[in-house]
A protein has these predicted regions:
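Extracytoplasmic
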Residues: 1-173
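Beta1/beta-strand and adjacent pyrophosphate-binding region of the FAD-binding site
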Residues: 175-187
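N-terminal Rossmann-fold NAD(P) dinucleotide-binding loop
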Residues: 190
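Aromatic pocket-lining residues of Rossmann-like dinucleotide-binding sites
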Residues: 197
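Conserved dinucleotide-binding and phosphotransfer motif residues
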Residues: 200
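Short beta-strand "acidic-cap" motif of Rossmann-like dinucleotide-binding folds
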Residues: 203-208
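Conserved N-terminal glycine-rich FAD pyrophosphate-binding loop of Rossmann-like flavoproteins
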Residues: 211-222
């Protein structure tokens, strides 16, 4: 086995003039929001969820600096997780805020599939530290994957893997290391297999799509 792809990921920050991207799970303070990894293999990242059992949770907060002043258009990748039951009113809704001022549109109302929802537009000052936050409105599991800001009203984010890699700063490199064995999955079986092989002097690559090892016996399962 002599060819593997290694990814480098930048989670939050400006990557192009007139654009800004932030992963929700990389906010400095998640407040009452929690990180959920259940769709990581589909989405390419975790997302955060406002699990308040019907009571709005504390805001998730981070601080940003935009590259220029002007009118910024905001999009949030989210979904209405209750839309599949056609109940009429989305259960988990929230607002995107800058310095405690909310964009005009309520989020989490855009259908059952993950997609970019337009939050609204706002005049923002470049080069100044701004407080960006997610304000939960219901406490019923509103979901937020990422935030995208742009000064171009025609720069509408695409719900594609290619766009996601571009804005998240993901680059792929060939790993020139030669491996004797590749183990896919860091559950109990995969972790034990990889450790046993290493102890026998085998050069092993363990591939895992979770932040911790252990599978159903990991700290993710509570």
């Amino acid at each position: 086995i002599n060819r593997l792809i290694r990814c480098k990921i930048r989670r939050i920050g400006v990557f192009k003039v007139g654009r800004f991207f932030a992963e929700a799970e990389s906010f400095e303070n998640l407040g009452g929001w929690v990180v959920d990894q259940q769709s990581m293999n589909i989405m390419g990242s975790s997302y955060i969820m406002a699990h308040g059992l019907g009571s709005p949770v504390a805001n998730a907060v981070t601080h940003i600096k935009l590259p220029e002043s002007g009118k910024w258009y905001a999009y949030v990748r989210t979904r209405d997780w209750t839309a599949v039951w056609k109940r009429g009113t989305p259960a988990g809704t929230f607002k995107l805020m800058i310095d405690d001022v909310g964009f005009e549109n309520t989020l989490g109302t855009n259908g059952e599939e993950w997609d970019w929802q337009y939050a609204g537009a706002m005049e923002l000052e470049g080069g100044k530290t701004l407080r960006m936050s997610l304000r939960d409105l219901t406490g019923f599991n509103g979901r937020c994957d990422a935030v995208f800001l742009t000064t171009d009203k025609n720069d509408i984010p695409k719900n594609t893997e290619e766009f996601r890699r571009e804005v998240s700063g993901v680059t792929a490199e060939e790993d020139e290391t030669l491996y004797d064995m590749v183990v896919c999955g860091g559950g109990i079986a995969g972790t034990c297999m990889a450790l046993a092989a290493v102890r026998e002097g085998i050069n092993v690559c363990l591939i895992q799509d979770r932040p911790v090892l252990g599978g159903c016996n990991s700290s993710e399962i509570k």
